[in-house]
């Protein structure tokens, strides 16, 4: 049954990618394709907008630098904080669905990707004791001639920079993410996203504020079924 769910996700992924392609960033492909040898971001290996060699930068902890951006300007991130930061990086660089939320003003960027409240709260909890100097990681850096990032402000704890998980999710990457009012029609950067994506795509022609209660109910029902299948699969492997 879990294999059926994965197959369904592959079908959804294929149809989505034909419609949206990939973002137009410096590491993105023109269109998603399989990358079976990914070192990280394996959630997207069956249909990826990044090449496998890009993920080498994310494969070893602690992560120092990704492309021309250093992650350790205020000291190394804790492993738990690094893991969440990596999930966001993987989504932006590799997800075949990211272009569903492309920013029309800048086609290498995303806008208003719906994240689950629980994901944002867990991310904040993981990073609250780490330090940061840029409120917006996209704009609040001093960039040198090579494009590398340097702090313009002093390093402070995440818990001082951001009030809570909602503030962090809706500030750290500028307008890239928003916290969803739904607990199902939102992304968690894990396999459960295969359920949410199907229903988010069906709402793609609607205004984001007009959330369909029927879609919410259908999503919740399928999410419960998916979780049960995952639990069943885990028990079979024991």
Curated annotation (Swiss-Prot):
* Organism for this UniProt entry: Gallus gallus (Chicken)
User: Per the UniProt annotation, where are the glycans attached?
Assistant: 53, 164
State a single Pfam family of this protein.
Folate_rec
Q: What is this protein called?
A: Riboflavin-binding protein
A single Gene Ontology MF term assigned here is: riboflavin binding
One annotated Gene Ontology cellular component of this protein: external side of plasma membrane
Q: Name one GO biological process term.
A: negative regulation of sensory perception of bitter taste
Question: What family classification does the UniProt entry report for this protein?
Answer: Belongs to the folate receptor family.
PTM statement from Swiss-Prot or TrEMBL = Plasma and yolk RBPS have the same carbohydrate components, whereas egg-white RBP has a different, ovomucoid-type carbohydrate chain.
Provide the alphabetized UniProt keywords.
Disulfide bond, Glycoprotein, Phosphoprotein, Pyrrolidone carboxylic acid, Signal, Transport
Query: What's this chain's function?
Result: Required for the transport of riboflavin to the developing oocyte.
Report disulfide bridges, numbered on this chain. Answer: 22-49, 41-90, 50-94, 74-155, 81-127, 116-186, 120-169, 133-151, 184-219
Claim: Endoplasmic reticulum is one of the keywords in the record: no
């Amino acid at each position: 049954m879990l294999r059926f769910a994965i197959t369904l996700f592959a079908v959804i992924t294929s149809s989505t990618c034909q419609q949206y392609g990939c973002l137009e960033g410096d590491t993105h492909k023109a269109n998603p394709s399989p990358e079976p040898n990914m070192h990280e971001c394996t959630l997207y290996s069956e249909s990826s907008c990044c090449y496998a060699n890009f993920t080498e930068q994310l494969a070893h902890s602690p992560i120092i630098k990704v492309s021309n951006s250093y992650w350790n300007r205020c000291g190394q991130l804790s492993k738990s904080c690094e893991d969440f930061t990596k999930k966001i990086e993987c989504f932006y660089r590799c997800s075949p669905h990211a272009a569903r939320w492309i920013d029309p003003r800048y086609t290498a960027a995303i806008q208003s990707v719906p994240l689950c409240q629980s994901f944002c709260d867990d991310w904040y909890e993981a990073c609250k004791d780490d330090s940061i100097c840029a409120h917006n990681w996209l704009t609040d850096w001093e960039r040198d001639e090579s494009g590398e990032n340097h702090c313009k402000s002093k390093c402070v704890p995440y818990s001082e920079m951001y009030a809570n998980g909602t503030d962090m999710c809706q500030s750290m990457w500028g307008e890239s993410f928003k916290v969803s009012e739904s607990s199902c029609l939102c992304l968690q950067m894990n396999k459960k996203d295969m359920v949410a994506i199907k229903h988010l795509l069906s709402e793609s022609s609607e205004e984001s504020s007009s959330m369909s209660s029927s879609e919410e109910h259908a999503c919740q029902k399928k999410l419960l079924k998916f979780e049960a299948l995952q639990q069943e699969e885990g028990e079979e492997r024991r």
